[in-house]
Amino acid sequence: MTAETIIINTGAVPTILPIPGLAESKFAVDSTGIQRLENLPKRLGVLGGGPIGLEFAHLYNTLGSQVTVLDAADTFLPRIEPSIAALAKSYLEEDGIQFLQGVHTQEIKDGQNSLTVVTDKGDFEFDILLYATGRKPNIAGLDLENTDIQVTDRGAIKVNRHLETSVPGVFAVGDVNGGPQFTYMSLDDFRIVFNYLTGDGSYNLETRNNYATTLFIAPPLAQVGLTEQEARDKGLPVAVKELPVAAMPRGHVNADLRGAFKAVVNPETKEILGATLFGEAAGEIINLITMAMDNKIPYTYIAKQIFTHPTMAENLNDLFAI
């Protein structure tokens, strides 16, 4: 195949850790396989405490499975504001999900109708085990070793700021280039390549705007920018405010008082440094904050913005009244 422009967009595939018995187990599935189950597992084990694992843990718990999350990390959601992460964990536990942190899996043993996960903290028996231990760039079958296309130490296709590989005219977009693994980032990768091919190339990885993330549990948990600790570690002037959903009118209308909003700002420049929203509509409202950050809108402006009532968005008035 020959072309002036070639774009590689092969995505990512689940990472299978070298745990004895995992790859061979007929009761262990990845994030694709768990969507193809014909029967609801009575006991579901989830290996990994990242977004994929937690979203499926929440889903299957809601459907009626007894869910246990085995997480090798010592801290639950370590990249989330600690106070918000603690709330999220407590709600999921109240809903019936069991969490075990700092668990190291040693072996998977299949039985007749179930499997046993052997760990350093005991053995656990499940009907189905979801292994959600990360995803890696999907370069298998591309035969890159027969080309001049370079890959990183982590197995991603190496790209420059325009997402062009080491071979001119060949671009890599989406998960395969080692960037943030979100569908909307793959779409933004397209914008970068399109701008380079048809414009002036001014929009690239170095000029890319802020982007938010959302963990789709109940309630949803969304975040953009820096956490309080990250901002302090950078030596920035920091002011913070945390607002419980229980203090929000719409929370009472929704009859759901779970969650909290937290903002991190620079009191000297009036910039928004980051925000974490945990509550109904968080995945929607976080985009308003992201746009404000991209356009350097001071947090003092949002504190005085007129919002409709009663909405969750109107609580940005109080959140940014710092």
Regions found by a protein language model. Give the residues of each.
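Glycine/serine-rich phosphate-binding loop and adjoining beta1-alpha1 elements at the start
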Residues: M1-F27, R43
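Short hydrophobic core segments
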Residues: T2-G11, V46-L47, V67, F124-G134, ...
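Rossmann-like dinucleotide-binding cores of NAD(P)H-dependent redox enzymes
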Residues: P41-G45, P51-S114, D120, Q181-L187, ...
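FAD-site-proximal beta/loop scaffold in flavoenzymes
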Residues: E24-P41, F124-D200
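Short glycine-rich anion-binding loops that position phosphate/pyrophosphate groups of nucleotides
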Residues: A12-P14, G134-P137, V245
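A short alpha-helix-loop-beta-strand transition element characteristic
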Residues: V13-T15, Q150-V151, D200-A212, L236-K241
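Short loop/edge segments at beta-strand edges and connector loops
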Residues: T10, D30-T32, Q101-V103, K109, ...
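Flexible, glycine-rich terminal cap/loop adjacent to redox cofactors
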Residues: T198, F216-T227, R232-I322
